[in-house]
Amino acid sequence: MLKLFSAFRKDKIWDFDGGIHPPEMKTQSNGTPLRQVPLAPRFVIPLKQHIGAEGELCVSVGDRVLRGQALTRGRGRMLPVHAPTSGTVIAIAPHSTAHPSALAELSVIIDADGEDRWIEREGWSDYRAHSREALIERIHQYGVAGLGGAGFPTGVKLQGGGDKITTLIINAAECEPYITADDRLMQDCAAQIVEGIRILAHILQPREVLIGIEDNKPQAISMLRAVLADAHDISLRVIPTKYPSGGAKQLTQILTEKQVPHGGRSSDIGVLMQNVGTAYAVKRAVVDGEPITERVVTLTGEAVSRPGNVWARLGTPVRHLLNDAGFCPSADQMVIMGGPLMGFTLPWLDVPVVKITNCLLAPSVAEMGAPQEEKSCIRCSACADACPADLLPQQLYWFSKGQQHDKATAHHIADCIECGACAWVCPSNIPLVQYFRQEKAEINAIRLEEKRAAEAKARFEARQARLEREKAARLARHKSAAVQPAAKDQDAIAAALARVKEKQAQATQPVVIQAGSQPDNSAVIAAREARKAQARAKQAAHPMADSAIPGDDPSKAAVEAAIARAKARKQEQQAGSEPAEPVDPRKAAVEAAIARAKARKQEQQAGSEPVEAVDPRKAAVEAAIARAKARKQEQQTGSEPAEPIDPRKAAVEAAIARAKARKQEQQAGSEPAEPADPRKAAVAAAIARVQAKKAAQQQVVNED
């Protein structure tokens, strides 16, 4: 009994709320086998044919490409696209694509050369020898995406499933009217589809694999059962025909009774779903080594004379496919990409076929009926009864029309699958799906803007924080530099202080001259040279003009001379009580010679350098003082014995003094001399004469 219940549950199917039963209109195209379409002369390949960002271009204008060659690089969710045939890239520019508004997207335009040459293909016939990651990467790089209409990258979907997938569902329902692409593919390529399903099962390792197919496809069901006759790892489930049983959430509920939560994904309940066309593309990518360059497209409608299903190369213009099917357009002809409920009308026929294109419907005017005027909502709730997602379409309609985005979001407008069942049953002919699409687009735009604003705010706050940190660090560096200078600065400061102290010590140190020793006049000479340099610089900066020296008052000069004579007599009277320092006649002779040389040098410089004005009164006073000193020295010679003088040494020293005098005279022309003071020169000359007389007298005494 338990086995009976288990077997019953194994084949059990469930139902979902809502749904409709529109005319199927599938017999127009599912009766003829798949056929090839002649190559178009030009192909337009949009870079974005899937959910996610477009890939990075890896070709340029003028490049020759082969069929299957990658035109873009795929990283992350960026899925690459490949050349549908061999030819030359003539342009890379925006072109209108498969979109309700025919938006222009960046596309690669290729002129076919007619040879249709493939790249070198490397298939993995023994795919089980490769790792799960390698298989997923190959599927992704070969451009496989969901071919049921969503266009989600298959590799990303498999990678996101991970180890939590317990049920793999293959969607073969194909519930929308007119479309028979999957039906015909299952009839002609059932074995390849099953092989692709096994590759997916090998990657995911689920507990069960289910194929869901509607009961209005008897030929496809029989072909699958024939292929799965000896297989026990894949179960074929035939479900009643009901629209939209092919929806992902609806088919999951039919086969497993599980419902995907609001805002969630099927992987949250351990389910992953793939389309039969996707399974076939996986087989060709892994086993045959062929990127996705073509897909099955249904050409149907009363406006075409040869309806059916064809292998259409991606990038083929819609006009080329319809012309091959015998398209006979009327005056107000429309062409729908997709089905009559979920498709959209093309504004022109130069739009290319992409990976999500499963049908091109060209109905006649009678087939579609006359357009009806939109009326006001009567709140009949027919749309709510038909909604397979358990939503309230009439409320969403009012929220969308009134721009009440928050309320529309709260009523789960994101769960709308845009199946069109509500618009189909609406007695007021309200295009509800169009309102819902526009509302979802506006909500997405608002969220994107909020995200950008949040990112901009985060960047601004991060920048402000960085600037504050840099400012604090800069202030800290300045404070530390002010408190404690660097080692180099400390050394420089210490050296400067040492120099200042040394100069102060030199300035305050007295000059001591010891009798009988040669004084060190280097410091005095250096100071004199410095004063000379300052004087020359001052004269160069501020040249002075010669001016006449006015004469002094004669009465004042006479008074000063009398005062000088009185001082001289007083010094003569004191000569007897104070001992005088003995004078060396040799030194006196030398000093006299040096004084004469300086006098000659000063006379030579008198013509070139201005002479400081001499005060006659001071000169007379100094001369009187000099004579008094001379008399005092003469009086002292008789009281104290003098040191005996060697005449030969005196003669030698006199000769040396004369030689030095000549040398100084010779240097007078090349080196500028310090301006001499005439007063000092006169005093020095008088002292020299007195000392010379004293030396002569002393010599006579010694001879006697």
UniProtKB/Swiss-Prot annotation:
The keyword Transmembrane helix does not apply. Residues 368-397, 407-436 form the 4Fe-4S ferredoxin-type domain. [4Fe-4S] cluster 1 binds at residues 377, 380, 383, 426. One of its GO terms (cellular component) is plasma membrane. It is found in: Cell inner membrane. It is a peripheral membrane protein. InterPro entries: 4Fe4S_Fe-S-bd, 4Fe4S_Fe_S_CS, Ion_transpt_RnfC/RsxC, Nuo51_FMN-bd, Nuo51_FMN-bd_sf, RnfC_N, Soluble_ligand-bd. Its cofactor is [4Fe-4S] cluster. GO terms for molecular function: 4 iron, 4 sulfur cluster binding; electron transfer activity; metal ion binding. Keywords: 4Fe-4S, Cell inner membrane, Cell membrane, Electron transport, Iron, Iron-sulfur, Membrane, Metal-binding, Repeat, Translocase, Transport. Its EC number is 7.-.-.-. The keyword Iron-sulfur applies. PROSITE patterns: 4FE4S_FER_1 (PS00198), 4FE4S_FER_2 (PS51379). Belongs to the 4Fe4S bacterial-type ferredoxin family. RnfC subfamily. The complex is composed of six subunits: RsxA, RsxB, RsxC, RsxD, RsxE and RsxG. This is Ion-translocating oxidoreductase complex subunit C. The lineage of its organism: Bacteria, Pseudomonadati, Pseudomonadota, Gammaproteobacteria, Enterobacterales.
